[in-house]
Each structure stands twice: as C-alpha cells, then as structure tokens.
Amino acid sequence: HTYTTLACHVLARYKRMQGYDVMFLPATDEHGQKIQDKAAAKGVTPQQYVDDIVAGIKDLWKLMNISNDRFVRTTDAYHVQSCQKIFTQLYEQGDIYKGCYKGHYCKPCESFWTDSQLVDGKCPDCGREVYEAEEEAYFFKTSKYADRLLKLYEDVPDFIQPETRKNEMIAFIKQGLQDTCVSRTTVPWGIPVPFDPKHTMYVWVDALSNYISALGYGNETYDDYEKFWPADIHMVGKEILRFHTILWPAMLMALGLP
C-alpha cells in the first residue's frame, strides 16, 4: 500500500506543478471477514481495530510527506449512505438478484472461486488455502456486461496498462464471466443491505464505490462529482486488478455512469 500510494503522490504532485486541479484520494478498506476475525482475536471491536490501523497509516503518510486531498474511509457515514443507494438502485433495476452461493472462498483475498478457477486446489491469486462456503447471497450480473467490457478494452486500448495485464483480463472474461457475489449473511461487520438487513454488502462493492462516494455521488457531504469524474487515472496493485478492471467498470455501466 505504501508503494502504490507513494507512486500516486508523486504523480499528483507532478500534475499540480503542471497546473492541474488534482483530487488525490487514498483510502482504507475497513469492512469484511478478515477484519472482523482479526479484531475478535485481539479482543477489540472491528471499529476500534480499524481506527488503530488508520491512525498508524496517517502517521506514516506524515512521516513520508505523502499528500492527500481527501482521505477516504469505508466506515465513514457518507460512504455508507452512497453504497446503500447504489446497491438499492442496482437491485431495483434488476442488476442485483438474490441467490445462493456455494463454492470456495479465500479469506485473505476476500474472493469467491469455482472449482475450475482453483490452482492445485488453492486460491489462484495468492496460493493460499480456500474453504467451502454456502450461504444465501445477492449477486451482481457481471456476466451481462462481458461483451461491453471487451468492447471497452478494444475501443480504449490504454484502459488497462501494461498490455500484459489487459490480455490477462481479456482471457479471464473470455473463459466465461460469472456473476459476482455482493453480499454476506455470515459477516456482520459490513454495510447493511438497506432492504434486507440480515445481509451486509460484500467488501468489493463497498470498497469500489469509494471512488465516487468521496466526490459526493449518492450523498450530501461532498459536491465534486461533476468536476472530477470520470477519473483520469486509477493506480492499483496487480493483485486487485480484476476487481478494478472488470467488476468496477461493469458496476459503472449498470449505474449509467462514465
């Protein structure tokens, strides 16, 4: 995280020197099962646990002189408000539906996998053990947007850089894009689904929405959305590329946003 944030900081400073009006948004992803489990192991609440981590991150940013225009926390009230509006809209228009998830789950990556996606029975992203999971869940119709995603990559050749990573995502889509699990009933540490509160939002829908919630989309706290969106650049680690280049643009397509 320090590596990626430092690279973003350098780019933000360079663009400011060129005269651009820059909005640099580092963030912390604070919900999910691994946070809940680690907090329990330490004997503190999940909120206390993430508050301590965030304090350390902010101290590190000061030490390294890393700038930020707005520090985003996914536990912030305005972000929760935005996520609930986004989830409700996607459900009401039919892009989110209720089903049952049965398969494999990697807790460190917070990712669900089918049998065919595992590598030697382990998570294809991190190589760790997975465990069997079965629960009622809501799903986002990612598969509905497969053709539009491929066309996006073709029409905007530099949408994903470097080229090798773009080719990975194209291959992933062409092997058959599955709908994405977007809620949990077994993880209370998350944003409640407003119309079905026994469910909490799965962490990726929550986390990805921060890019627009931090600009005021779906809330009254900020009003920078029209000025700064769409973003000129997302700088992300290779381990979360799939979520940012497949799930996130598919969500934006569903919302009718650029």
Predicted regions located by residue number:
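Predominantly a Rossmann-like dinucleotide-binding segment in NAD(P)-dependent oxidoreductases
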Residues: 120-121, 135
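N-terminal Rossmann-like or analogous alpha/beta NTP/dinucleotide-binding catalytic cores
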Residues: 1-96, 110, 151, 251
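The −1 position to Zn-ligating cysteines in a subset of zinc-ribbon hairpins
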Residues: 89, 105, 112, 122, ...
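A short alpha-helix-loop-beta-strand transition element characteristic
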Residues: 96-100, 130-131
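Structured secondary-structure scaffolds
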Residues: 1-26, 73, 78-82, 108, ...
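Short metal-coordination and nucleic-acid-contact micro-motifs, chiefly zinc-binding Cys/His arrays
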Residues: 102, 119-120
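Cys/His-rich microdomains that often coordinate metals
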Residues: 113, 129-130
